[in-house]
C-alpha cells in the first residue's frame, strides 16, 4: 500500500476520545483526519480546532460544511483562524447539504451549483487576502476583506474541496475546487462516472484530472470476526439504502431491494425501523458498497477504491475497535 489514508470521525465518539484517535492516527502515519458536519448533531469546527491543537503533522478537514447556513465571509474567517492554529494543515470541505434535512430547517436549496460557485469563489478570495465585492444570487459582499489588526496580513494556505455526489456538481468541482471529496457507500465502479465529470470540469479551465485531489469516504468495518464486521456495517448501509436510493441504484443495488427497504423506513427512520429493514440486506450488498470484514478483506476492498481513482481513502470506522482499523492501515 503506497497511497495515503485518512480517518473520518462523526459523532460516535466523545470529542476527547476523538482527539486521542487523531493522535493515534498521526502516530501511525495517517495523512489526515476529517470531521463530519452533515447532520444536526456535531459541528465540525469545534473538534477540528481540538484536533489541530493536539497534533503536529496530520491534516484536518471538514467533511463537509454546508454552503447555506454559513456566510462566505464567516467561512473565510473561520478557516483563517483554524489555519492560525495549524498553519498549512487545514482543508475546507464544503457541500450542498441534502433534503429533507435542509428543508426541515428552512433552507431552500435552490440553484446549488450557482451558490456553490459563489461561495467557493468568495471564500477563496478572502483567504487569499483579497478585497472581495460580490452581488450574486446568494453571496453579497461589499468591499469585504479579512480584518486583520493584530496579526500578519497574509494569504492563508487553505485548499477548498467540494463533497460532490451528482455529476453536475462533480463537473463544477473539477472546474473550481482544489479537490473532490468522493462519497461513501458507493461501489468502486461508481467512480467511473464521477472521474469523467471531474475531468470535463477541469478541461474547462485548462486543468486535468491529475490536478484535482480525490479523497474518498469509505465505510470501514474491521473485525477479526468477519460476521461481526459485516453486522456492524449493516445498519448504516440500511439507513443509506432508504435515504439515497438513487445513488444505491447507480452502484448496482437491485431496485427490488430498494423498494423493500423503502416500504419499511420513514424519514427520519426510527432505530427499530432500521433494525427491521436491515434483515433484508444481504452480506453481498454490505461488501459491495463498504470495506467490511477481516483486516485482509478490508485492505483488498480499499485497494479497489484506489484503483478506481481515489487518491486518499478517508476511512469511516464502524466496528468498536477503531485502533484495529487504524493499525490495519498503519504506514
PLM features per residue range, with description:
Residues 13-25, 78, 164-172, 233, ...:
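Short, acidic/polar
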Residues 29, 51, 82, 123, ...:
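Conserved, mostly hydrophobic/aromatic
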Residues 41-50, 186-202, 323-325:
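Active-site-adjacent beta->alpha loops and helix N-cap segments on the catalytic face
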Residues 1-62, 158:
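N-terminal beta1-alpha1-beta2 module of alpha/beta enzyme domains
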Residues 3-16, 65-72, 154-165, 220-221, ...:
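Active-site mouth loops of central-metabolism enzymes
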Residues 3-9, 33-35, 60-63, 90-94, ...:
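Hydrophobic faces of well-ordered beta-strands that scaffold small-molecule active sites
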Residues 110-150, 191-193, 199-307:
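An alpha-helical appendage that flanks or caps ligand/catalytic pockets
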Residues 45-65, 69, 118-122, 126, ...:
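Alpha-helix-loop-beta-strand connector modules within alpha/beta enzyme cores
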Amino acid at each position: 500500500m503506497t497511497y495515503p489514508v485518512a480517518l473520518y470521525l462523526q459523532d460516535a465518539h466523545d470529542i476527547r476520545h476523538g482527539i486521542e484517535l487523531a493522535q493515534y492516527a498521526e502516530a501511525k502515519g495517517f495523512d489526515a483526519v476529517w470531521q463530519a458536519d452533515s447532520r444536526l448533531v456535531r459541528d465540525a469546527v469545534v473538534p477540528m480546532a481540538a484536533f489541530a491543537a493536539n497534533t503536529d503533522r496530520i491534516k484536518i478537514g471538514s467533511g463537509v460544511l454546508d454552503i447555506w447556513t454559513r456566510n462566505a465571509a464567516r467561512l473565510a474567517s473561520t478557516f483563517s483562524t483554524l489555519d492560525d492554529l495549524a498553519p498549512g494543515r487545514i482543508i475546507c470541505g464544503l457541500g450542498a447539504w441534502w433534503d429533507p434535512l435542509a428543508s426541515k430547517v428552512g433552507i431552500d436549496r435552490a440553484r446549488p451549483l450557482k451558490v456553490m460557485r459563489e461561495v467557493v469563489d468568495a471564500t477563496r478570495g478572502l483567504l487569499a487576502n483579497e478585497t472581495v465585492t460580490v452581488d450574486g444570487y446568494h453571496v453579497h459582499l461589499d468591499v469585504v476583506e479579512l480584518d486583520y489588526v493584530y496579526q500578519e496580513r497574509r494569504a492563508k494556505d487553505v485548499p477548498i474541496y467540494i463533497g460532490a455526489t451528482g455529476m453536475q456538481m462533480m463537473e463544477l468541482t473539477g472546474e473550481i475546487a482544489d479537490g473532490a471529496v468522493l462519497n461513501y457507500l458507493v461501489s468502486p465502479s461508481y467512480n467511473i462516472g464521477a472521474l469523467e465529470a471531474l475531468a470535463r470540469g477541469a478541461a474547462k479551465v485548462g486543468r486535468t484530472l491529475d490536478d484535482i485531489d480525490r479523497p474518498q469516504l469509505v465505510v470501514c468495518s474491521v473485525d477479526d470476526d468477519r460476521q461481526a464486521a459485516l453486522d456492524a456495517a449493516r445498519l448504516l448501509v440500511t439507513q443509506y439504502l432508504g435515504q439515497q436510493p438513487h445513488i444505491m441504484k447507480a452502484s448496482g443495488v437491485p431496485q427490488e431491494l430498494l423498494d423493500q427497504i423503502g416500504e419499511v423506513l420513514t424519514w427520519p427512520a426510527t432505530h427499530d425501523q432500521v433494525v427491521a429493514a436491515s434483515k433484508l440486506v444481504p452480506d453481498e450488498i454490505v461488501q459491495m458498497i463498504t470495506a467490511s470484514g477481516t483486516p485482509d478483506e478490508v485492505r483488498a476492498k480499499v485497494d479497489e477504491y484506489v484503483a478506481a481513482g481515489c487518491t486518499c481513502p478517508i476511512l469511516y470506522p464502524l466496528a468498536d475497535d477503531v485502533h484495529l482499523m487504524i493499525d490495519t492501515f498503519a504506514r
